[in-house]
Amino acid sequence: VTLANGADNRIVTTTSTSGLNGESNLTFDGTKLSVQGGLIHKRRAVTSNTTAANDDYYLGVSASSTVTINLPNASTLTAGQTFVIKDEAGSLSDSVVINLTPAGGQTIDGQSTLSLNSPFAAVNVYTDGATKYFIY
């Protein structure tokens, strides 16, 4: 990897044959980020009740009984941060659901809990970075 250091420690040029990995926060201040090739998101397998970590992105649920995923306090996240939750097993029904629950007093599109109960259902939620989550 070759990085050229510009003003204010900004990367002005980068070339790599093996990729660029940001160990902490990698921020692009321009108008767009163009990615050629694939984009790989972090995936975590979920089989029982859990709390999403601040650095989670995709939570793939495979469970034969109801699972509750507690979302982090929105104020600990960056506005626009996204979580994807998916029933990978296709086992959801009226009696087997995925419940998404934000931190106390916070909401998802105005609701205190969001429940998925259709086989292979998925939902994308993002936060305002303060008190709310939204479905998109």
What annotation goes with each model-predicted range?
Residues 2-6, 20:
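Disulfide-braced loops of extracellular cysteine-rich modules
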Residues 34-101, 127-136:
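Exposed extracellular interaction/assembly regions and N-terminal maturation sites
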